Amino acid sequence: MDLPPALLSFYCPIASEVSPEHEAVAQEMYAWIHAMSLTSDNRQAKMLAQAGAGFNSYFTPRARGELARALSKYNVCAWIANGMVQEIRDPGTFGAMAARWARIMEEPATCPADGIPMDFALADAFSHIRRTLSPVKWQHFSAAQSHWMHGLAWENCLHQVKGLTVHDYLSFRYVMSGCFAAAAFAYAVPERHPSAEEWAHPKVRAAADAAMMVDALDNDRYSYLKESLTEADKKTIFAALRHENPALGREEVIVRGVQLRDRILTLYLTLRGELLCDASEGLRSYLTGLDLIIAGNLVFCADMGLRYGLPEGSVRTDAEPLDRTVAPPGIGAIDHWWAQAGA
């Protein structure tokens, strides 16, 4: 399939970093995956180990030592859970599992004695994370990840829905893709974090939400080819745009999706610049963490390109956005972010 040039050309003026511990952590994750009986397939175990360590190495490259290993365990579990959304078609069955996992994330001791391997793996991962974080960081992180489980349950229910508007898609994507959950990594990893007042400031929240929505829309771009070839019933920004505008051709749908993503990234860069003018050390660390997640997502998905069926070298960065518009896009689900620019 010929891919429109805009699909895999990513505007991103943010530098990425890579953890020097990647290979060591990946080897440990491979052994842990087998110890937790998450798979008996060595090839699958190797892929999961690289994915789990890769999330840490590219998204949170400054997490080292025990924290890197604890987060990588969770990343493995998150990868598996995300895949199960498509495999289990009964919302009741998946919802029951997601609810159990959400509670294990909040309190690992609730893991049932007769649970499945995924239950035990999550309990081990979150017990490990709890030991490495301060109580404040732990509560923040575990609550955010539990929140993501609700999004996965929603996504599983959407198998029964034919189409979503762009507004509804972005509202659901915020939770399903883990925007709130992903930003929690930027809070957990640095030694210093923003105060409660700084973190809750509307401009900080708008910046974090916009940053993580960029990641979510980038993931739609990475998975486009694989889902087109398999005819997967996956809700994406492109499917939502086509649902609202059935007459649009494939390339125009992709261009509009990329333009929306670039407008959101442009807004994030504006909000970040305003916040950095008088930011505390903790807030600066948080914003740097958001930067690393955005840039790291590009490196990670290029590295994991085979999973998405992408041709080698097809992921590119671009110095210019497809859309420089500074006004809100007229989508109720996200327009309020723009109100914080200049506020």
From Swiss-Prot:
<dbReference type="InterPro" id="IPR008949">
    <property type="entry name" value="Isoprenoid_synthase_dom_sf"/>
</dbReference>
<keyword id="KW-0479">Metal-binding</keyword>
<keyword id="KW-0456">Lyase</keyword>
<feature type="binding site">
    <location>
        <position position="227"/>
    </location>
    <ligand>
        <name>Mg(2+)</name>
    </ligand>
</feature>
<feature type="binding site">
    <location>
        <position position="219"/>
    </location>
    <ligand>
        <name>Mg(2+)</name>
    </ligand>
</feature>
<keyword id="KW-0460">Magnesium</keyword>
<comment type="function">
    <text>Diterpene cyclases that can form multiple diterpene products.</text>
</comment>
<protein>
    <recommendedName>
        <fullName>Diterpene cyclase DtcycB</fullName>
        <ecNumber>4.2.3.150</ecNumber>
        <ecNumber>4.2.3.149</ecNumber>
        <ecNumber>4.2.3.151</ecNumber>
    </recommendedName>
</protein>
<dbReference type="Pfam" id="PF19086">
    <property type="entry name" value="Terpene_syn_C_2"/>
</dbReference>
<feature type="binding site">
    <location>
        <position position="223"/>
    </location>
    <ligand>
        <name>Mg(2+)</name>
    </ligand>
</feature>
<dbReference type="GO" id="GO:0046872">
    <property type="term" value="F:metal ion binding"/>
</dbReference>
<comment type="similarity">
    <text>Belongs to the terpene synthase family.</text>
</comment>
<comment type="subunit">
    <text>Homodimer.</text>
</comment>
<dbReference type="GO" id="GO:0010333">
    <property type="term" value="F:terpene synthase activity"/>
</dbReference>
